[in-house]
C-alpha cells in the first residue's frame, strides 16, 4: 500500500512497483490536499464532504510537543458521527458507563451563550479507594470533533481530541463511523520526563486505556443510532 511508500526527491515511491508519484500526480493518480499536524495526518476530500473547504483542519490548543506524549486510538462503529459526538457530550456518561475508571463526577458548568462548553469535576480511579481528581472542560471546535481539556489537577494542560469520521455505509446500508482519538498528555512532574523517554512502552498502554473506554462508548453510540434509525428514539 502507498501508505508504506518511501519518499524520495519529493515523490512518493511505491515499494512494490517503483512507481513515483509527484505533487501533480500521474495519469490515473490524483493528489489530494493533505495536512500533517504532528499527531494526526489529514486528507481533504472535497468531492465527498459537500462542505466548504478549509485550508487546514480546525485544531484546538495542544500542549507543547517538546514536553508532551501523544497516542492515537482508532475504532469503527455502526453509527453516524452525531452518535459519537452525543456520547462525548453526555457529561454524566463517564460515571454511568465507566465506573471502573471514573468516580464522583459532578457537572459544575453548563454551556451558555458566552461560553459553549461543559465543565466537570471527576476523579480518575487508580484503585478502588484511590482516585486522582481533575477539572475538565468539553467543547467542540468543529461539528465532528469533541475536545476534553484538563483545566486543573493532575495532567493540567493535557487534552483528548475525539474526531468522528464518516466512512460511508456497510453491506447492509448502515452508516459506519471511525472514532479517531488523540490523547496528548503533559505534566510538570519530574517522572513524566521519564515516561516520555519510554514512549514506545507508554503509547500502547494509552491506546489500551482508550480502547477499553471506547468498547463501552461505541456500544452507546451504536445503540443510539439503532434507536434513532428505527423510530424509537425518545423525543
Task: Describe each region flagged by the PLM.
Residues 1-59:
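Rieske [2Fe-2S] iron-sulfur-binding domain
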